[in-house]
Amino acid sequence: MENYVPFLVSHWRTVGLISVSIAAGVALGQLNQTHERAANKSQRVHTNSSIKAKQVKRESAIEQINEIEDDDEQSLEDQDVLPILFQYEKPSEADSIRRSEEFYRRMNQRRSVREISSDPVALEVIENIIKTGGTSPSGAHTEPWTFVVVSNLEMKQQIRQIIEAEEEINYKQRMGDVWVQDLQPVGTTWVKEYLTEAPWLILIFKQVHGFKRNGQKKIHYYNEISVSIATGFLLAAIQEAGLVTVTTTPLNCGPSIRVLLGRPVNEKLLLLLPVGYPKVGATVPDFKRKPLHDIMVHYQ
């Protein structure tokens, strides 16, 4: 070592630079190894993610295949449905205008009436109204509706108790000041006398799904839209029969009422219609309907 001292003293800058370069090279090599290990790890993670993504995609494809198979099975169930000739007699233009105008005039008398008489209404009238609702179109002709009609006073009292208990909470806590204020012109509260005074209650359930002949679930396409359209048919039939109703949406009451009525879990309460004749002297808010030019857009 003593023999190298004069050399180191004379060339210490060069030796220092070489040492620093060597150290930097070693550090760089270690850094590259670290990056390489990280890259390999990232590649493995990416590969695993890709594998998982492919697995999810594969499982999704399997689910789609299963759905297609379900649809095929449903089609097989309906394979005996053959087309028939549509029975139709075209009216004259004058007759079509007359009929449409007469129907409009009758429907324009429809109002939401909350003061409903307890005067009896024949069961046959209610059955005809329900049959009319059953003529409504539905997604893939699944007819995803159940209309529960109640005339039993004790059952109506239990339904009213459930609804009023929830409605009081709705008005005081859930709905908010703006919603409650918007209802003031209508004059509604959580007290619903018509639920026990009306001779009939029609509870409208949507079937979230049905069941095939083999017991498997059957898809009910657009079930809520289909049932809502059917409700429109019911409202028209009620008006045509000379009866009144008010469309109610029992918020947060569905499960309790479903259990009370013994309905299956695939049915969800959508709407409730109390049906009967109006009380003598019944009043309604003096609302005006929008004119035609506000609700119709015509492109020629």
Swiss-Prot record:
Pfam families: Nitroreductase (PF00881). One of its GO terms (cellular component) is plasma membrane. Its EC number is 1.21.1.1. FMN binds at R110, R111, S112, V113, R114, S138, G139, T247, T248, T249, R289. 3-iodo-L-tyrosine binds at A140, E167, Y171, K192. Keywords: Flavoprotein, FMN, Membrane, NADP, Oxidoreductase, Transmembrane, Transmembrane helix. One of its GO terms (biological process) is tyrosine metabolic process. 3,5-diiodo-L-tyrosine binds at A140, E167, Y171, K192. Catalyzes the dehalogenation of halotyrosines such as 3,5-diiodo-L-tyrosine. Likely to also catalyze the dehalogenation of other halotyrosines such as 3-bromo-L-tyrosine, 3-chloro-L-tyrosine and 3-iodo-L-tyrosine. This is Iodotyrosine deiodinase.
